[in-house]
């Protein structure tokens, strides 16, 4: 089910990441945390989902700024390549923002494929960016220019050097 921007989720009985904090409820609306407090009382009709998190810790999403989302490796040959990252791997690791980049393999993997994978993660509701460039000199880009890639492609926020 595709969630709207105003769907509310209530996490009950979780311990915030700060270990000194008592058990709290967390009210989320869309992508925003609205309230963190003990025993939040919201009319049931406004809540899309209630999750009992008793015994669980609520932590912020992690930002991983160096991920080979299209796969990695390859310097040892074709059998040495690592497969592309799956969204479920980000979920399992608690990563909510990712910056993808090419690794040593700028030949069988491309900036175009990297941008496409970044767009796919964004379409799935994650926050994803990527870096243009590769190990090679002159570096690989999508437009033929590092400056143009960064200027005109929204997902590209820098260059791998």
Model-derived regions, located:
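Histidine-rich, glycine-flanked metal-binding segment
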Residues: 2-9, 16-59
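Short amphipathic alpha-helices and their capping/turn segments at secondary-structure boundaries
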Residues: 45-56, 87, 143-152
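Short coil/turn connectors at secondary-structure junctions
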Residues: 5-7, 46-47, 54, 58, ...
